[in-house]
Amino acid sequence: MDKQIGLQIHIRIINFPSTEAALPEGCENLASTTSPQMFNNFFKALTLLQQLLEEILEECRPNCLVADTAFPWATEVAGRFGIPRLIFHGTSYFAICAFLSKFHHEPYKNTVSDSEYFTVPGLPDHIQMTKLQQPSYFKGVDDEQKKLTDLSVQSEVTSYGVLVNSFNELEPAYSEHYRNVFGRKAWKVGPVSLCNKEIEEKSLRGKAASIDTYECLKWLDSKRPNSVLYISFGSKYRFPDAQLLEIAKGLEAAGQDFIWVIKNEDKQELLEEFEQRIAKDKKGLIIKGWAPQVLI
């Protein structure tokens, strides 16, 4: 559609340096990582994209560079070519503001235990969390992620501005807070998921779904509106057996209709009896692997 209205769009495909970063060939996104070491190697692979990007910029000479927050080196590269760099954030203003508040003030360091609540300072709302709920790099157990986080924050400070996957009606207080408190230029470009209109487009966002999309919709349509709980912990988290079983027990005890997305595709036997019971009662749907989240 953009080409039809006269925009000159050209797509350049480059090879992701999986093997150069000690990743299996074809491992090109976080959903394909299965261990903390693979996770760290994935971000090492991202740094190897710098030279490839510089070669493209040398050839194409664009007026601006838009790069995800996971590429902190992109600001320096853009500066080398004399063009502004805009950071793209796939998360909301609220998530960004909460993260930056914790990053700068480190309120979790004042807690006595991992389960003690602390207040995230300076936000428009009173938000409380525990140290257990924090990413590993905030807890000092992941040096590689800490380095990347520090570089990303510094890169955001020195970049020209930020594009955020949000819209004003969703969180006006936090869009203002981000600009006024953190002093960033920011533009709302969301929700970007609306670019996908057809069922097939929605079901294939990110990668192919591991469940038949029509089977999923048929199950959802059999339930009352607003009656189904959706549980997903993101593409990178895989739980130990004990936690998976506790979640399963909690869902079964609640008696709530649910869709549960599990990234542990290898846990078929562990939850086999649970799956049989919920399938018989038609209370739940378990998706192992990638879920058609936008479609759902």
Predicted ranges, named:
Residues 1-294:
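Nucleotide-sugar-dependent glycosyltransferase catalytic domains
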